[in-house]
Amino acid sequence: MRKFDYSFLNNGMLPSSLINITGSIYSLRTAEDYRKSDYAKVFTELESIAKVQSVKSSNAIEGIVTSDQRIASIVNHSSAPLNHDEAEIAGYRDALNMIHTGYEYLSFNEKTILLLHETMMTPSSDDLAGKYKQNDNVIVEVDNYGNRRVRFRPVPANETKQAMEQLELAYLEACSDSNINQLLLIPCVILDFLCIHPFRDGNGRMSRLLSLLLLYKNGFDAGKYISFEEQINKYKDLYYDALQRSSAGWDTNANDYFPFMQNF
């Protein structure tokens, strides 16, 4: 069984580049707080734009698409979904809205994770909405010639619930350590979530929702105004390269979190 342990974030051996980046982000957050009060109308408009971009981009990463006009209509509740892809888009909208409006009341635990997944998958009538996978899954990579290979084998279905419980406990333990920087902890937790791959479908989109949830809960709400998901989609080759490098050796506790942390 994979061991979830984030104590390495408090061993004084973190790369200076990561320390410098987090320092800059904290400084920018302080500046943003002042701008919000001075330019409230601008931030309201940015939030509206970013919400559409987030819903569009997070789904586009998974090949779920429709026209920009239809996405805007769905996000703004001015039109109902017309097909399966649009139902998936509506589901992400609903889960994202849940985080935007109620993140203070959503803890990082099994109840919240299953609720977000159920909210996201219910509009598309997924029979496993809000439920962990029932069969083992693999992450397959297809090269330019159409050849497939197994890139990663996630946690087996019968070990998923226990793995998710251990992930939650490890996160809570790390949160109680005042010497662990939350900005560095969050990408580690998200990487582990992706490697567990607890659901039959929707793991990638869930990882982005959980990223936003944890960022918001720790006072980093830039994702409300500049789409976090759009940035991943824009640089997805770099994102997937970092994910692949950081997931190598994960099942034997030999992986390196730093590439994914740096990308995050």
Residue ranges of each PLM-predicted region?
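FIC/Doc superfamily catalytic core
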Residues: M1-F264
